[in-house]
Amino acid sequence: MRLTAKQITWLKVILHLAGLLPFIWLFWAASQGYFSADPAKDIQHFTGRMALKFLLASLLISPLARYAKQPLLIRTRRLLGLWCFAWATLHLTSYALLELGINNLALLGSELISRPYLTLGIVSWVILFALTLTSTQYAQRKLGRRWQFLHNFVYLVAILTPIHYLWSVKILSPQPVIYALLALGLLAWRYKKFRQWWR
């Protein structure tokens, strides 16, 4: 049975809660001293993982809609992308304020350039920023064919962000590897699409 427009609306509500409730938990956990001896790192990793989860979820929508024969699922993709950007912005902000400190924000530019894993992160954020700005139907009409070209850069983000995560951890653990494999799998599903571009 195919999902109805009303069911998609309720699904969007659930997805909004999935994006908002972790933020409420994060605020509570930080206020209660829930994190380790290095809470700044914990918060950075948490916000980064949330951004990556929403990115992977947005990439999952197309194959899921196709194989489950639920075309209306595509309507949730933009919402997932917006939450990805929101959490990515929190991730960047947490690094700037908690790692560098408000008195050292002038160092942010040099830090992003001098540390390769940070460079990958900021490139991904800039792409997500551009995709967010042009995610409306109005932007799609204005850009025409260029809109699809621009939004194909989400696949570059799907490559860069798992590398950024793997590179940022001092001790390799299963979690970043799992995210990298999931991203690789979602990109591999689009293999034929990529081949058409390269011809």
Curated annotation (Swiss-Prot):
What Gene Ontology molecular function terms does this protein carry? electron transfer activity; FMN binding; heme binding; metal ion binding; oxidoreductase activity, acting on diphenols and related substances as donors
Subcellular location(s) per record:
Cell inner membrane
Q: Which UniProt keywords apply?
A: Cell inner membrane, Cell membrane, Electron transport, Flavoprotein, FMN, Heme, Iron, Membrane, Metal-binding, Transmembrane, Transmembrane helix, Transport
Q: Which GO terms describe its cellular component?
A: plasma membrane
Q: How does it sit in the bilayer?
A: Multi-pass membrane protein
The protein's required cofactors: FMN; heme b
Cofactor binding note from Swiss-Prot or TrEMBL: Binds 1 FMN per subunit.
Report disulfide bridges, numbered on this chain: none
| Record GO biological process | protein repair
One Pfam family this chain carries? Ferric_reduct
Keyword flag Phosphoprotein: no
* Top-level taxonomic group: Bacteria
Membrane-spanning ranges: 8-28, 82-102, 116-136, 149-169, 171-191
Q: What's this protein's family per the entry?
A: Belongs to the MsrQ family.
Report the protein's function. Answer: Part of the MsrPQ system that repairs oxidized periplasmic proteins containing methionine sulfoxide residues (Met-O), using respiratory chain electrons. Thus protects these proteins from oxidative-stress damage caused by reactive species of oxygen and chlorine generated by the host defense mechanisms. MsrPQ is essential for the maintenance of envelope integrity under bleach stress, rescuing a wide series of structurally unrelated periplasmic proteins from methionine oxidation.
**HAMAP family in the record, alphabetically?**
MsrQ
Its quaternary organisation is: Heterodimer of a catalytic subunit (MsrP) and a heme-binding subunit (MsrQ).
What is the name of the protein in this document? Answer: Protein-methionine-sulfoxide reductase heme-binding subunit MsrQ
The scientific name of the source species is Enterobacter sp. (strain 638)
The gene designation is msrQ
